[in-house]
């Protein structure tokens, strides 16, 4: 760090898959909480640098929010519903501690669901798009394996998310601040899946089957953010539509399947 002398540090490294955290809670907590602490401690002890630091928390910190408390603003109580979410509560608090205790220019985001091309196939929309692409090429039977389809999510495009992160650290950054960031379109996982299927060349043939292995013991079932604070501060607004994001995601998996790449079916 002292050699590179960064102006900005974006800390997004994490064990970021909630379902994995149920089977690997210790690794998730260590990676996400202690990993954040080690990075911020290292930056604190570096000489002659004072970067603006983005610590990426998660909307999962809010967990199971009653419908009457929607949309979720920054002051909504934490109610984490997975070891991953607990680890992100720790990440969130470690970041704010370093801002308050040491004056480091740390800002924290609670990003709601964002997706697009290249998102890993452990996440619902990516595994659905991947399965659809494989079905279109007759690589698997026309059955999409799913988990819980009733959770409500607010969707944004990863390209909008990256733009938000850049604006976070460049538009009047305020040490210790924390922001909810997310899209404006929300729907259930089922509705998202139905939209992806509607884009398929084999939409009339595709069936849906619940796979118990894909279900979490507990889920954050209502994720609708109030992003007023960040929008008012930075001027950021999502620009890419849900429909465009889903189209691009499916095209990404079609191109990977068409390339002949070998990968596991999830």
Annotate each language-model stretch with its function.
Residues 161, 165, 181, 192, ...:
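Non-catalytic, hydrophobic alpha-helical segments
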Residues 128, 171-215, 227:
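Mid/C-terminal beta-alpha module of Rossmann-like enzyme folds, strongest
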Residues 23-41, 49-51, 60-108, 115, ...:
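Catalytic helix-loop patch of NAD(P)-dependent Rossmann-fold dehydrogenases
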Residues 242-266:
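Amphipathic terminal alpha-helices
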Residues 158, 178, 191, 212-237, ...:
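Conserved C-terminal active-site "lid" loop/helix of NAD(P)H-dependent oxidoreductases
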Residues 1-31:
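NAD(P)H-binding glycine-rich loop region in Rossmannoid oxidoreductase-like domains
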Residues 9-13, 53-59, 109-111:
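SDR active-site strand-loop-helix element
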Residues 65-71, 93-167, 184, 189, ...:
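NAD(P)-dependent short-chain dehydrogenase/reductase
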